[in-house]
Amino acid sequence: MTTSSYFLLMALGLLLYVCQSSFGNQHTRTFDTPKHRCGSEITNSYMDLCYRKRNDAGEKRGRASPLWQRRGSLSKLKARAKRNGAFHLPRDGRGVVEHCCHRPCSNAEFKKYCG
């Protein structure tokens, strides 16, 4: 193999690498890309999308809510869900697990389950 052929092969490989890395970013997730949420991800999404939306004033004053501080406490979240019925109301005949775990859902669709 001559030097010019070797140089051409290396240049072609480098060009292919640059093209692949620049065009490969088209399939990255955005904030509202639909995704599957199951198990603790449903709880975390509820806390992030639903509770934070209602408590923005408290966060602006630098106070975190007690429920947010005890994020791992599923029993308080269950009590809150029973109190306001957020997870018990069927939406289009489906629950949040059916809608967001078995099928992907966006953040906007998930917010429909906020109380």
Curated annotation (Swiss-Prot):
The modification Cysteine amide is found at residue 114. This venom insulin, from a fish-hunting cone snail, facilitates prey capture by rapidly inducing hypoglycemic shock. It is one of the smallest known insulin found in nature and lacks the C-terminal segment of the B chain that, in human insulin, mediates engagement of the insulin receptor (INSR) and assembly of the hormone's hexameric storage form. Despite lacking this segment, it both binds and activates human insulin receptor (long isoform (HIR-B)) with a high potency (EC(50)=16.28 nM). Residues 25-29, 53-94 form a propeptide. InterPro entries: Insulin-like, Insulin-like_sf, Insulin_CS, Insulin_family. It comes from Conus geographus. This is Con-Ins G1a. Disulfide bonds join 38-101, 50-114, 100-105. It is found in: Secreted. Expressed by the venom gland. One of its GO terms (molecular function) is toxin activity. Belongs to the insulin family. GO terms for cellular component: extracellular region. It comes from the Eukaryota. Heterodimer of A and B chains; disulfide-linked. Its main location: secreted. Keywords: Amidation, Carbohydrate metabolism, Cleavage on pair of basic residues, Disulfide bond, Gamma-carboxyglutamic acid, Glucose metabolism, Hormone, Hydroxylation, Secreted, Signal, Toxin. Venom insulins constitute about 1/25 of the total venom of C.geographus. It holds the Pfam family Insulin. SUPFAM superfamilies: Insulin-like. The modification 4-hydroxyproline is found at residues 34, 104. The keyword Ribosomal protein does not apply. The modification 4-carboxyglutamate is found at residues 41, 98, 109. GO terms for biological process: glucose metabolic process. Residues 1-24 form the signal peptide.
